[in-house]
Amino acid sequence: MNLILAGLLIMSILSMILAMIAFWLPNMTPDTEKLSPYECGFDPLGSARLPFSLRFFLVAILFLLFDLEIALLLPLPWADQLTNPTLALTWTTSIIALLTLGLIHEWTQGGLEWAE
């Protein structure tokens, strides 16, 4: 009990010391660059309402859908331990078929073409 109490006391004191150092140590000299919001890849002093590529948005949504497919199919190797593995195989086949049909539709509509 004394060892646990001593460890808790040491951790509490160390946490307080680190919090005080973090409060008193930082350099407080703000300038315009430090006060402006940081936007990765964009000019921070320019307009925030620049046009956004719709093609990029569609490709990003497609990436998210297929990433979700991978997340749904990852537990598939453990499906053979179920009492009815054919049901898991049926669901897996239907998910892959649905996503493949969606990909074919997107391909025929020209959604995957970057340049027109």
From Swiss-Prot:
It is found in: Mitochondrion membrane. It is an enzyme of class 7 (translocase). Keywords: Electron transport, Membrane, Mitochondrion, NAD, Respiratory chain, Translocase, Transmembrane, Transmembrane helix, Transport, Ubiquinone. Belongs to the complex I subunit 3 family. It comes from the Eukaryota. Its EC number is 7.1.1.2. The keyword rRNA-binding does not apply. It catalyses: a ubiquinone + NADH + 5 H(+)(in) = a ubiquinol + NAD(+) + 4 H(+)(out). PANTHER family: NADH-UBIQUINONE OXIDOREDUCTASE CHAIN 3 (PTHR11058:SF9). GO terms for cellular component: mitochondrial membrane; NADH dehydrogenase complex. It is a multi-pass membrane protein. InterPro entries: NADH_UbQ/plastoQ_OxRdtase_su3, NDAH_ubi_oxred_su3_sf. The chain crosses the membrane at residues 3-23, 56-76, 85-105. It comes from Latimeria chalumnae. Pfam families: Oxidored_q4. The keyword Electron transport applies. This is NADH-ubiquinone oxidoreductase chain 3.
